[in-house]
């Protein structure tokens, strides 16, 4: 996130319809994509008439001397460069928040104008920013971009920031609008649309990170019925305009429980992919366990910050070794159920660009090759392929957002991205496969991706001077001679693989040159046994559509089962099936595909009872706790943990800003009568149940809900 006429209408509607019907339609399956992150204002000026619009005049600097002003990039500019993006192998673009942003200048400490060029101070989430589109805040430019992207085989992800509106102490004072109608602002908040708790002081406090203010940005109260409906309607509006996914800004700071219902609302409306920004340095972060529990259960994947830290350390420093990356992968993979949906990256708009911390193109190429071949969904920050960076003040905000000035298609980084993007399309090992470290020292990392018998083996030597002899290497590649897939782009040797057993075939000793990256690969021939590589979403209620992706499904429809119950098949192809979740018991079910007599592997899917409603549960005068003890909620539905009493299984921990009263927002099934109780989980794991009968509550059919009970002694 950012720190601090009739004919025209007809054309717009036509473009929107085209974008919806010609969408790449595998939006729920992103595992084989290459995402390209764009700060719209800094990419390309495709329409000079929107640079200084009347309703927000004076915020544009054509000289580009003021780094906190608008510089002219717009949606038309991205559309104009669609062939450039497609030529690089980009299959999805993540654009900065396109919603109508702050209209007023808030001078910096030196009196210089500042603007919300980055998009993270939304004032109207149902209109398009005039600097990005046109003076009427219409959707025309956005619809045209989506249509152009889809016709180029590129998906569109919008950055969505439901945590806050605009600055709360200046400018428009957090004012928020609903398609032009004023709803309220932070300073005159009689409706309670905002939280008023001051700025976050303790970044490891669960209550503060969700309910306090992020850098003076008016913190929205998503538990308010109006704000809940508003944000979900805004997301659905983007879906109506053809977007394929959402990058949810600052998920660590938006009410965690409410976001389950946001994701469910999106998935109920249509095919999509969601991932969020949960900033953390590494797996020792105090809230790391909260991050993986959120990702495992909410339906929202995350940006892989722990791996990002390791990538920047290993490739950005002369002293760090590949053990950092190997450890990060091991620790993250052990905790995240859907690790292949994590979005991997080298840098982004909130940190110095890689070349600002290590101005070495060889190291950048190695980091790029690693990101494009390791587990997860790779995301490339705009300009990386052109070696774009500005090192002023260390290259941090705003100097990590320079103007894109070159669009060369001949750079090594551009062609490396293209080459490995093509491999992600042709070899399922990169999108769906396991990842195994095969050989490692401080400078060399050799790892293998494998999906059934399709294999990709990658070797990286980051030493600038030492060639390493590689002996004792084993691989799942079949016996044979393999040339470097990256030949002509990056240097690397061929290898010879002998016959072994158990997926451990010996590689003849070879030398891995300094500053080299080599990729060797094998694609298994098509067969008749279905192979599931992905399902999306991973959680939902009966009736919701689920995309099952993989290979060998055949051209004739077979059977998709959730547990032992057959699902209604909506569409079927050899690599993709869309089916509706059948009426089965809530909880984890195994999805399988049957083709003739052949049955696929199974992938887990969490079945909910109904669409989700955010409900705030409060328990008063709970049993006393000491440091390390927490109150949790558990109950008779999968959403409440099915009476689980562990940290990872129960729902919580709850928040206690007015101890001994505790509260927690949880998304639960609409219209259902649920049973629940509160428990204390002590620091040593001991569980204390409240006494008495189970509490019962009838969840509203829509909107939001509130429960307020006393602890039963």
Question: What is each stretch, according to the model?
Answer:
Residues 593-595, 680:
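Conserved structural position at the C-terminal beta-strand
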Residues 34-39, 92-97, 119-127, 155-159, ...:
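Structural recognition of the beta-strand scaffold that forms the well-ordered cores
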Residues 27-34, 39-241, 257-291, 298, ...:
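Substrate-binding/active-site clefts of carbohydrate-active enzymes
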Residues 496-511, 681-713:
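Structured interaction patches on ligand/partner-binding surfaces of diverse proteins
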Residues 525-557, 598-610:
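Beta-strand/beta-sandwich contexts
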Residues 145-154, 164, 232-338, 342, ...:
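Active-site-proximal helices and loops of the catalytic beta/alpha 8
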Residues 623-673, 681-700:
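Aromatic-rich carbohydrate-binding modules that target alpha-glucans
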């Amino acid at each position: 996130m950012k720190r601090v006429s009739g004919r025209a209408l007809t054309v717009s509607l036509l473009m929107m319809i085209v974008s919806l019907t010609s969408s790449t339609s595998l939006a729920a399956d992103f595992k084989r994509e290459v995402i390209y992150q764009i700060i719209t204002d800094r990419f390309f000026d495709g329409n000079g008439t929107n640079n200084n619009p009347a309703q927000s005049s004076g915020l544009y600097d054509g000289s580009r001397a003021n780094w906190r002003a608008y510089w002219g990039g717009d949606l038309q500019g991205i559309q104009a460069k669609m062939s450039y993006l497609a030529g690089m192998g980009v299959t999805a673009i993540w654009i900065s928040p396109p919603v109508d942003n702050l209209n007023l200048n808030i001078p910096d400490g030196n009196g210089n104008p500042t603007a919300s060029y980055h998009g993270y101070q939304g004032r109207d989430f149902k209109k398009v920013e005039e600097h990005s589109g046109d003076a009427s805040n219409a959707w025309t430019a956005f619809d045209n971009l989506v249509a152009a992207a889809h016709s180029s085989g590129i998906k569109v992800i919008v950055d969505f920031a439901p945590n806050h509106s605009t600055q709360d102490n200046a400018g428009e004072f957090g004012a928020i609008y609903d398609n032009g109608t004023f709803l309220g602002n932070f300073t005159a908040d009689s409706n309670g649309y905002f939280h008023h708790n001051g700025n976050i002081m303790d970044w490891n406090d669960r209550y503060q990170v969700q309910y306090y203010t992020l850098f003076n940005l008016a913190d929205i109260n998503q538990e308010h019925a109006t704000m809940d409906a508003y944000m979900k309607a805004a997301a659905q509006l983007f879906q109506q305009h053809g977007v394929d996914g959402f990058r949810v800004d600052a998920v660590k700071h938006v009410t965690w429980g409410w976001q389950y219902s946001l994701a469910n609302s999106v998935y109920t409306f249509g095919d999509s992919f969601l991932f969020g920004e949960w900033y953390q340095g590494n797996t020792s972060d105090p809230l790391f366990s909260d991050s993986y529990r959120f990702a495992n259960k909410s339906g929202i994947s995350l940006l892989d910050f722990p791996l990002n830290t390791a990538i920047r350390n290993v490739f950005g420093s002369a002293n760090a070794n590949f053990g950092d990356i190997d450890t990060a992968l091991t620790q993250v993979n052990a905790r995240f159920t859907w690790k292949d949906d994590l979005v991997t990256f080298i840098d982004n708009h909130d940190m110095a660009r890689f070349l600002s911390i290590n101005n070495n193109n060889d190291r950048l190429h190695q980091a790029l090759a690693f990101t494009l071949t390791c587990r997860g969904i790779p995301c490339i920050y705009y300009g990386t392929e052109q070696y774009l960076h500005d090192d002023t003040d260390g290259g941090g905000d705003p100097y990590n957002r320079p103007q894109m000035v070159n669009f060369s298609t001949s750079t090594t980084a551009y062609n490396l991205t293209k080459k490995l993007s093509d491999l992600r399309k042709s070899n399922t090992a990169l999108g769906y496969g396991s990842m195994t470290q095969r050989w490692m020292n401080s400078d060399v990392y050799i790892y293998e991706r494998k999906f059934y018998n399709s294999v990709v083996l990658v070797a990286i030597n980051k030493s600038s001077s030492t060639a390493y002899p590689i002996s004792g290497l084993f691989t799942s590649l079949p016996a044979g001679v393999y040339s470097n897939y990256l030949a002509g782009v990056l240097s690397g040797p061929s290898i010879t693989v002998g016959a072994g057993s158990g997926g451990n075939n010996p590689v003849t000793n070879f030398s891995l040159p300094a500053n080299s990256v080599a990729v060797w690969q094998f694609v298994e021939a098509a067969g008749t046994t279905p192979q599931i590589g992905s399902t999306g979403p991973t959680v939902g209620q009966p009736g919701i559509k689920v995309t099952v992706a993989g290979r060998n499904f055949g051209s004739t429809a077979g059977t998709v089962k959730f547990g032992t119950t057959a699902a209604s098949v909506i569409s079927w192809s050899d690599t993709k099936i869309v089916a509706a979740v059948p009426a089965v018991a809530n909880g984890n079910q195994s999805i399988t595909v049957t083709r003739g007599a052949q049955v696929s592997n199974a992938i887990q899917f969490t079945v909910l009872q109904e669409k989700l409603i955010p409900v705030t549960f409060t328990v008063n005068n709970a049993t006393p706790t000491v440091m390390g003890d927490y109150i949790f909620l558990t109950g008779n539905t999968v959403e409440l943990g099915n009476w689980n009493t562990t940290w990872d299984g129960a729902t919580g921990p709850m928040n206690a800003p007015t101890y001994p009263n505790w509260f927690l927002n949880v998304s639960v099934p609409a219209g259902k009568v649920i049973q629940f109780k509160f428990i204390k989980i002590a620091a040593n794991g001991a569980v204390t149940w409240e006494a008495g009968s189970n509490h019962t509550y009838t969840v509203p059919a829509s909107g939001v809900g509130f429960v307020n009970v006393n602890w039963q002694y």
